[in-house]
Amino acid sequence: MFRIYTAHSLGQKWVENYQECSAIFACIVGFTETGLIPGISAAGATPEARKYTAIADAEFLINGVQSSYHYPLPPLSQGVSPVFITRAVVEACNIPIYLFNAGLPTPPSVPYIDLKGKSANCLTTGKALPLPLVYELFQQGLKWGKKLAKDHTKNYLILSECVVGGTTTALSILTGLGINATEKVNSSHPHCNHKQKELIVKEGFKNAGYSYNLKPINPFELVAAVGDPMQIVVAGMAISASLKTGVMLAGGTQMLAVYALIKSIINTSKYQGNLDNIIVGTTRWVAEDLTGDTVTLAESIGTVPLFATQLNFSSSSYQQLQMYEQGYVKEGVGAGGCAIAASLSYNWTQEKLLNRIENLVNNYHRIRN
């Protein structure tokens, strides 16, 4: 029920090493004011709604279906939040959840681990985050990755994200690491807004004093200039955890950017990780998005095994889920990674996964109405 799209032999080796293990799920939430640019993201119908997307997703991830919410899931122009996919799996499989706040404007209403970060300024400023904070968030990531791997020796880690506007900060990181990602990234829109993203990234590079010429930049300085707080936390977590266990970076474009960041940090600093233990896991809607080029992007980064769940909503009874097949939403909150884990570690079929997701959507609407 999942497919390996790139670096097949490395990916197959990862499967052999970890398919008998169960998963631990960590979600790292953060915010960038890039997400408030009109039209940049479909993860929330308005810029105001997008301020609360990550907080609402976090609440649903932890609590599931409730009669009321501190922060209800924001309306989307089409489709439904990918957190329904994630919650369906973690709830039924009893997967432990760790929620990390890397930098939100408003703290989550559910229990979380505070990494003492802050929201990023819009990347167009060229001053997204203070450099000392980037180093501190990286150290927090190293600490927690090591701890999670030590506390769960018989598990692999799924590291997920929720950052609205994060595919645009991902494009800036990929570009700054010397990777040609032009027209290869994805978005929550059915047709990726490549031109808008590119103009935003170019403005950020100009204001940061960087030339837009695919010449690699120091990874920490790059995140400080045009990144977001989630990226550097997940990079730190994956680097330290990979020395002990398997790591699945659960996401599409955003996690490919994090993988590229990890490679750059390992290659240019004293920090050591085991790249053979790290894969990227996403959805078919990302991997096969014709308005981006995820597979070529993964190959440009190097030997990164790109996995994608083959979950299909064509036969779903719910129109909100069917919208995924038309290119809306696609991924987020580790949806693809959890769907892969359901198949890899818990032997779920496509039918069982679809049934669990539909039951959750049904219960949500029944109780909310």
Curated annotation (Swiss-Prot):
Protein name (database record): UPF0284 protein cce_1085
Record-linked NCBIfam families: nicotinate mononucleotide-dependent phosphoribosyltransferase CobT (TIGR00303), PRK04447.1-6 (NF003373)
Gene Ontology MF terms in the entry: nicotinate-nucleotide-dimethylbenzimidazole phosphoribosyltransferase activity
Superkingdom of this protein's organism: Bacteria
SUPFAM superfamilies per the UniProt record, alphabetical: Nicotinate mononucleotide:5,6-dimethylbenzimidazole phosphoribosyltransferase (CobT)
Signal peptide as annotated in the record: none
Similarity comment: Belongs to the UPF0284 family.
